Amino acid sequence: MQCEQSKLTRILYQQLREKPDFELQFDAQVKDVTQHRSGVEIAIERNGRTETRTGRWLIGADGARSDVRRALGIEFPGFTWPERFLVVSTPFDFRAVIPDLVAVSYVSDPERWHFLLQIPSLCRVMFPIAPHESDELAVSADFAQSLMATVVPGVSNYEVAHVTLYKVHQRVAKTFQRGRAFLAGDAAHINNPLGGMGMNGGIHDAINLTSRLVEVWHGTKAEAELERYDRQRRLVTLEYIEKQSIQNKRNLESNGTDFGRSLAEIAADKSRTYEYLLRVSMIASLRRAQALG
């Protein structure tokens, strides 16, 4: 199942706005975080004014440039890939010209790999952009067409809905918890999108943390239970999400022959196939987190 983040957020928004004890505020920026023995206070800037909010805990799920993470003084080590990624969205129906094309298709090429993601009404095609290729060149119409012409021989002059160019990072916060404040999602970890592990990993963070908060809130578990969140989620992020997403990129940069042979060997062995599917589906990472206690 493919569900774009833009669609998921709208679904969540509709659900949350109907909750009587839930308040959604937009255009509000966290400026400071102060922790007390029994709670957290944040200063937010909204409509030109500074306001304060208090609570027992704080979850910073405010993206890769997290103001909460910065206010807490938590480092965000890692690296930025030298390549940028270009996404070209087109209504062209690749399934009509590529037999047996699936919803997500990866094409390895040491010169310039690409992958196709089919969503309702559009197909998104991603390419790496080399360091020597400027941003201006990358988003130009002619350059996008030249890349798209390599996808299917003989097909050119695609209708392009839009192009998006962005930098790609691999970073994991030094800790996912500081006192009564927690980090989740992109605020805690970011990775290249190959394999679809970013948003899924963030959802795993949310379920892991909030289930513990509910238990502590209702008094069925002590507050020490919350420390397991950082212990579990940060380690599996390093061991699985970061490691696998980096390997996915390296696989695409290969000539495809060795990787194809490796996949064929895995497919021929039921036990290895099972282990491989557990890993790439992220089920293995959930089991690993549970085993950490």
Over which residues does each language-model region extend?
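Core Rossmann-like FAD-binding/catalytic domain of the broad FAD-dependent monooxygenase superfamily
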Residues: 1-293
